């Protein structure tokens, strides 16, 4: 269960729970692979939590061009 950032705060940045999970999991994999962090400080030690913090901060968003490919 995540406490910070809250799911409600995250859903203000991303339009659906499915999109939120896909975005966060892809970013977490990038962080695991050594991608540079977008924030200077994180509350979470896990990459999935860090990805969600980046989403909540507005630094990580879904590419609108990618959503039109379906």
From Swiss-Prot:
The keyword Nucleotidyltransferase applies. One of its GO terms (biological process) is DNA-templated transcription. Its EC number is 2.7.7.6. InterPro entries: DNA-dir_RNA_pol_omega, Pol_omega/Rpo6/RPB6, RPB6/omega-like_sf. One of its GO terms (molecular function) is DNA-directed RNA polymerase activity. It holds the Pfam family RNA_pol_Rpb6. Keywords: DNA-directed RNA polymerase, Nucleotidyltransferase, Transcription, Transferase. It comes from the Bacteria. Gene3D superfamilies: 3.90.940.10. It catalyses: RNA(n) + a ribonucleoside 5'-triphosphate = RNA(n+1) + diphosphate. GO terms for cellular component: DNA-directed RNA polymerase complex. The RNAP catalytic core consists of 2 alpha, 1 beta, 1 beta' and 1 omega subunit. When a sigma factor is associated with the core the holoenzyme is formed, which can initiate transcription. Promotes RNA polymerase assembly. Latches the N- and C-terminal regions of the beta' subunit thereby facilitating its interaction with the beta and alpha subunits. Belongs to the RNA polymerase subunit omega family. HAMAP family: RNApol_bact_RpoZ. This is DNA-directed RNA polymerase subunit omega. The gene is rpoZ.
């Amino acid at each position: 269960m995540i406490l910070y950032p809250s799911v409600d705060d995250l859903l203000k940045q991303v339009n659906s729970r499915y999109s939120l999970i896909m975005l966060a999991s892809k970013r977490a994999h990038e962080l695991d692979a050594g991608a540079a962090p977008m924030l200077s400080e994180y509350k979470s030690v896990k990459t999935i939590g860090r990805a969600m913090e980046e989403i909540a901060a507005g630094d990580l968003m879904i590419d609108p061009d990618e959503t039109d490919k379906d």
